[in-house]
Amino acid sequence: MQSEALRNPRVIVVQKLYSQEFNKESKLTFPKHRYKKFIKDVVLGTLERKELIEETIRQHLSEDLSIKRTEKLLILLLQAAIFELLYRPQTSVNIIINEYLNTSKFFLEQSQKNI
């Protein structure tokens, strides 16, 4: 199950975004993968439109929340999902939401194992 999740393209997208967030100088690489083009498109598209996506998130946060106080992993998940919702209309909204919910479960399970 875990190795299957690690091959999930959206898990890889979030891992790439997380890596880039904390090591901005590192060069992004996209190893051979069945969904390499998808992964690359979502990662690069999310990074290119980061400010616009963050503004979209800010508009929908309640007043007592802020992006800076929200866990970074959650923000990255939201950024990638919002990118797909806005810029990849060929994928159904239901599929995007379901896939990112599953992706968030994977990362939650990983963080609980490390406690």
Predicted regions and their residues:
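N-terminal interaction/assembly modules
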Residues: 1-115
